A protein has these predicted regions:
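Extracellular and organelle-lumenal recognition/adhesion modules and their flexible linkers in secreted
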Residues: 4-30, 149, 171-406
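Canonical positions in the second alpha-helix
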Residues: 43-44, 75-76, 109-110, 143, ...
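Short coil turns that delineate tetratricopeptide repeat
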Residues: 46-50, 81, 114-115, 145-149, ...
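TPR alpha-solenoid repeat register
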Residues: 54, 86, 119-120, 150-154, ...
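Structural motif corresponding to the intra-repeat A-B loop/turn of tetratricopeptide repeats
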Residues: 63-65, 97, 130, 190, ...
Length: 406
């Protein structure tokens, strides 16, 4: 029986020895290819001539040494034609050495080999350098359809090709929510507010709560610039789609947001804004709903702990209704509501009566907008009156509403 095994052993030993030899050879080749000297990496290529990765390492070492690397890259491409990164490098090499035709062919080969962002980004840059808009825009659009991370370089390249915001938006920007969000951020950063308007509208139509901060920031920029209708259109889109937890606004009717304090103040757009003030703390009571403030007496002598922008009609009369109660605050409290033109700061009404009542109390404030007023600012003001100390105690608010009067 033992003799019968001898022929099998005679066959197995050479095969095992051959396999062991190649394992050691390939391992040694891999070790050499990771050296810092191009000559050592080249020795690794001789030991594993069919390994594309080692050819790429050789090209890297030769480039680092300032030597020619294209032969190693061409060999790597022949061994691994599906490696898009190699084709991109060959394309850039060809372009740098005055062969645009070969450069384009290599970059197109890279795009066919990979459905990822990098080959299309390389193609878009190539066509931008060639001043070829007909080929640039499709490649920029393709790149953005699969892009991730920081997209500002793509947007900057688009604006270097054209200063026409409508053309850029139509040809380059895909209807991807994440891309629209990033492009809106880019336009705000560049202060291109007019170009941002259709982008904000497109984003608002598909927005999720994740996009809310970006769109509210856009609304704030519009309000700062006096573009109330543009801000209101985006705001109402978000409200109608329940991205914002509010009812839509109407300058001819419901122009106040969340008068019952059903949601936490968002601090932007047409929502309530709580000012971070030393000596003042604030919070929302969910049931029953009201907003409360506590004044320590160490707050600034004049401050506005709460405010909201109101989209109003020019030359119209309004009535603000509200309920409040106070604790440990005297009659001359220094607390009142103030309504002003958001652009000029001019007062639109006499201030409300001083807020002071230990029990819940209903009150109202009438005001009239100026002929050019389309945005008002409602603010809760707190100031130290002459001869008095600063306010110290508590204030609660609920049931605010705003109606347009005949």
């Amino acid at each position: 029986m033992r003799r019968a095994r001898y022929p099998l052993l005679l066959v197995a030993f050479p095969a095992l020895a051959f396999a062991g030899y190649w394992s050691v050879r390939l391992a040694w080749s891999d070790h050499l290819s990771r050296a810092a000297e191009a000559e050592t990496v080249a020795r690794g290529v001789l030991l594993a001539p069919g390994d594309a990765d080692i050819r790429i390492r050789l090209a890297n070492q030769r480039e680092a040494a300032g030597a020619e690397s294209v032969a190693a890259l061409q060999a790597a491409a022949a061994l691994d034609p599906g490696n898009a990164a190699v084709w991109v490098r060959l394309g850039l090499y060809a372009e740098a050495h005055g062969d645009p035709g070969a450069a384009e062919r290599c970059l197109l080969r890279a795009a066919r080999a990979s459905g990822q962002f990098e080959p299309r980004w390389a193609l878009a840059n190539y066509y931008a350098r060639r001043a070829d808009p007909a080929h640039f825009w499709p490649r920029a659009n393709e790149a953005l359809r699969m892009a991730y991370g920081d997209l500002n370089p793509v947007f900057q390249l688009c604006w270097s090709m054209s200063r026409d915001p409508a053309l850029i938006f139509e040809r380059a920007i895909p209807p991807r929510r994440t891309v629209l969000n990033a492009y809106l951020a880019f336009l705000l950063w560049q202060n291109r507010l007019a170009a941002a308007q259709p982008v904000a509208a497109s984003l608002a139509s598909v927005a999720t709560p994740e996009d809310r901060p970006r769109l509210i920031a856009w609304c704030d920029r519009q309000l700062d610039g006096g573009s109330v209708p543009a801000a209101l259109a985006i705001w109402n889109t978000l409200c109608n789609r329940r991205v914002l937890p509010y009812a839509p606004l109407n300058a001819n009717g419901a122009a106040l947001t969340d008068g019952d304090f059903a949601a936490e103040p968002l601090g932007g757009g047409f929502a309530w804004r709580l000012a971070p003030l030393a000596g003042v703390s604030a919070g929302r009571n969910p049931s029953p709903r009201y907003l409360w403030f506590s004044f320590s007496g160490k707050q600034p002598e004049a401050c506005e702990p709460l405010a909201q922008f109101l989209p109003v009609a020019a030359g119209a009369r309004y009535r603000l209704r509200f309920a409040y109660r106070t604790s440990e605050i005297g009659e001359e409290s220094g607390l009142c509501w103030r309504v002003a033109d958001a652009r000029t700061g001019a007062s639109l009404a006499a201030s409300s009566p001083w807020l002071s009542s230990p029990a819940w109390k209903r009150d109202q404030l009438d005001f009239t907008t100026a002929p050019a007023t389309t945005l008002a600012r409602l603010a809760l003001t707190c100031r130290r009156l002459p001869g008095a100390t600063r306010v110290e105690g508590g204030l609660s608010l609920r049931g605010l509403s705003l109606e347009r009067l005949p």
